[in-house]
């Protein structure tokens, strides 16, 4: 149902939208007595839909910055009050939407939560400038330097540079 909603209905989620579709496309079938999994793999072995890409961008970009309650502002507020649990939670939500948009811009299904930085560096043709160093700064400072966290909305999420390709 989730793969149908995404792959055919082009419905976006807030983060990890195409993760189950990616798993279906890349899984190795070990046992499939009635060939149902194989049939699903054939059904969803289609090019990345433009409508899905657009839906993911439109659903997730406002949560990155510029809207209420955008995650960049929530991260800054949590950091300024010293609420480390909230910082962690907001950064995780931010990254879920961020990578959803990044993979959508690049027409890639979302590979899941593991090794996203490396996969993005290896496979994405559109990446923000200073992609890796921005994340290194984010992770090195997210619990120690609230001033650096304030730049998350401009430095790390420089995804707008990729959007004119699609709008």
Predicted stretch roles:
Residues 1-79:
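Conserved NTP/Mg2+-binding pocket subregion across the NTase superfamily
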Residues 63-70, 93, 97, 130, ...:
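Charged, amphipathic alpha-helical oligomerization/scaffolding segments
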Residues 107-136:
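Short, charged amphipathic alpha-helical segments flanked by flexible coils
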């Amino acid at each position: 149902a989730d793969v149908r909603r995404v792959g055919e209905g082009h419905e976006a989620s807030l983060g990890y939208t195409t993760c189950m579709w990616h798993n279906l496309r890349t899984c190795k079938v070990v046992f499939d007595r009635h060939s149902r999994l194989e049939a699903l793999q054939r059904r969803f072995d289609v090019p990345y839909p433009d409508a899905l890409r657009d839906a993911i961008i439109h659903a997730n970009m406002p949560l990155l910055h510029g809207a209420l309650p955008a995650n960049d502002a929530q991260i800054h507020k949590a950091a300024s009050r010293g609420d480390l649990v909230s910082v962690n939670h907001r950064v995780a939500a931010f990254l879920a939407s961020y990578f959803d948009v990044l993979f959508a811009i690049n027409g890639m299904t979302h590979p899941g939560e593991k090794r996203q930085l490396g996969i993005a560096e290896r496979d994405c043709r559109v990446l923000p400038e200073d992609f890796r160093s921005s994340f290194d700064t984010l992770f090195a400072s997210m619990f120690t330097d609230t001033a650096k966290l304030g730049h998350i909305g401009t430095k790390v999420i420089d995804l707008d540079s990729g959007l004119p390709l699609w709008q």
